[in-house]
Amino acid sequence: MRPLLLLALLGWLLLAEAKGDAKPEDNLLVLTVATKETEGFRRFKRSAQFFNYKIQALGLGEDWNVEKGTSAGGGQKVRLLKKALEKHADKEDLVILFADSYDVLFASGPRELLKKFRQARSQVVFSAEELIYPDRRLETKYPVVSDGKRFLGSGGFIGYAPNLSKLVAEWEGQDSDSDQLFYTKIFLDPEKREQINITLDHRCRIFQNLDGALDEVVLKFEMGHVRARNLAYDTLPVLIHGNGPTKLQLNYLGNYIPRFWTFETGCTVCDEGLRSLKGIGDEALPTVLVGVFIEQPTPFVSLFFQRLLRLHYPQKHMRLFIHNHEQHHKAQVEEFLAQHGSEYQSVKLVGPEVRMANADARNMGADLCRQDRSCTYYFSVDADVALTEPNSLRLLIQQNKNVIAPLMTRHGRLWSNFWGALSADGYYARSEDYVDIVQGRRVGVWNVPYISNIYLIKGSALRGELQSSDLFHHSKLDPDMAFCANIRQQDVFMFLTNRHTLGHLLSLDSYRTTHLHNDLWEVFSNPEDWKEKYIHQNYTKALAGKLVETPCPDVYWFPIFTEVACDELVEEMEHFGQWSLGNNKDNRIQGGYENVPTIDIHMNQIGFEREWHKFLLEYIAPMTEKLYPGYYTRAQFDLAFVVRYKPDEQPSLMPHHDASTFTINIALNRVGVDYEGGGCRFLRYNCSIRAPRKGWTLMHPGRLTHYHEGLPTTRGTRYIAVSFVDP
């Protein structure tokens, strides 16, 4: 008998051990309803997969039988749940979690969920809300709660399969009926509540409904993990539900929870689902329609088009739609198209003479892509975007989002092209992470409620969820806000990436159109673009000491201006036209007497004195301190002007000392092309510079040592820009 007894005992132990190996979560099933795979559903699945939940989606492929945006509905969810529970009704150990999916995400795993469910000591636990819905008349029938939320929420509940089967057994309603009202009436019936054994998650230990509780919920960063913390009850909910107006807050939380972004790891999902373009030849690249919008007077439009041309994307796979609202920019647009329009697959221009409204033009651009099935992407770019990264388009395509914008900010400011949150009336509100995203302390791909100025939209999205031909009208909102409101209404996510610096936004606040070349005045508002357009590309080499010549003792020669800077400064002066007479009487200067007169126009005559001083401070002062060690300058000046030399007007300049500590003399046109002769001779050293280079400046000491003269111009017209610095 003993051997048989031992075998029986061993078998019992093995069976017990096998049961002990079974994980509690093996008896957990998550049911949800999703009639189509929206971005919200994919987010729900991703958070569930992170914690290894078993999920079954009900209703995929069905029509949703309630009109979007209506307050009632949800009966379809009850119908689908009732049918799904038929095969589980007798599984007493099976725990079923039922939750919405489009606006829900998991913050913790099955083990914690089941632990908290069992601690509730009820067979069915519903989420609880601060607000009663849909029938406020039922408020008095609710049991009084001393601590916690009082009202039932149908967006999430958990229970044993037999009890849930009893819960939905009486459902005979229509798909358009309210599921919340159905469950509420069962809960408010004391007999049914006791029979099914229902309670509410009053303190949000399992479920967190954001509606009516936005101020209670904050992010809690743990080591390598992010939770939502309820401050009112000091709880860490397992599921977060953000229905209705709180979806935007769920989107914000979903940028982090459960571990999509942490301080330790950064973005953990930014490289998921990418569309790689590596190794793809030009012929196989997707077709992109580029929409360009010039809606107001904008600086550096010519530079905008140059940057467009520098994109590393074949023009034969790009189509252009340009809406130019401004007569002021008509010549620049036409010049660009005349020179480069034929390089693109197609071009459509809507000019200022058409007088098309901003929203209508943007609708037209999007619709051109929508109606053409070969249009894979629509790339909308406003003219105030400085797209400085040539790989911008490829990088955005690579992220593989329906709608995505790159972060763009204004120079030195927190102003950007996205909002991290919206106020109650739908306007700007600053999210907790806004500054960190703008300043690059948090880097990733962010789900945000508002983008503008530049974005990439998939053509398939325009032909699908965004198929409305009027995306840019919504109530009385401006086109940018209307666009975002319409996208949010379709439950399409708008993403913002700050993984790469693709460019910046121009400041338009102080832009004026009263000059011939208005960009010259933008050195304060848009210094980066001013530098790109007007400062010589080799200036940085000169600053590093690699491109500085010394043609005469203590005379330095280095590049400073671009060809464009030289041309525009000359044209601006000629456009102004009030050249001095070149005699000693000069009312423009203190005392009214000029000892060494030239035919010139002063910078202050064209309102350019502040801008010129900024130029001297930013670009001349650093060179001075390098070339004359120990001397530091604030680049003060009394005289800064453009001189014109002509054989029949004033061909040369008599020997003189400059009234300065040092002088700069910038050649504004080309010897041998625009004029002959000219140059500068330093008499004490018997040293002449006879072939000044356009855009290069001479820098030399002024009074005392460098006695010099202007050599005769024998043909054409010579222009130079001169400053007497630190007089």
Swiss-Prot record:
Keyword Signal carried by entry: yes
Catalysed reactions, as listed in the record: L-lysyl-[collagen] + 2-oxoglutarate + O2 = (5R)-5-hydroxy-L-lysyl-[collagen] + succinate + CO2
Membrane topology of the entry: Peripheral membrane protein
Domain Fe2OG dioxygenase: 636-727
Main location: endoplasmic reticulum
UniProt xrefs under SUPFAM superfamilies: Nucleotide-diphospho-sugar transferases
GO molecular function, one term: iron ion binding
Residues making up the signal peptide according to the UniProt record: 1-18
UniProt key word Nucleotide-binding: no
Glycosylation sites: 163, 197, 538, 686
Effect after changing residue 658 to A: Loss of enzyme activity
Cofactor(s) recorded in Swiss-Prot or TrEMBL: Fe(2+); L-ascorbate
Chain positions recorded as Fe cation binding sites: 656, 658, 708
EC number per UniProt: 1.14.11.4
Assigned keywords, A-Z: Dioxygenase, Disease variant, Ehlers-Danlos syndrome, Endoplasmic reticulum, Glycoprotein, Iron, Membrane, Metal-binding, Oxidoreductase, Signal, Vitamin C
Protein purpose: Part of a complex composed of PLOD1, P3H3 and P3H4 that catalyzes hydroxylation of lysine residues in collagen alpha chains and is required for normal assembly and cross-linkling of collagen fibrils. Forms hydroxylysine residues in -Xaa-Lys-Gly- sequences in collagens. These hydroxylysines serve as sites of attachment for carbohydrate units and are essential for the stability of the intermolecular collagen cross-links.
Protein name: Procollagen-lysine,2-oxoglutarate 5-dioxygenase 1
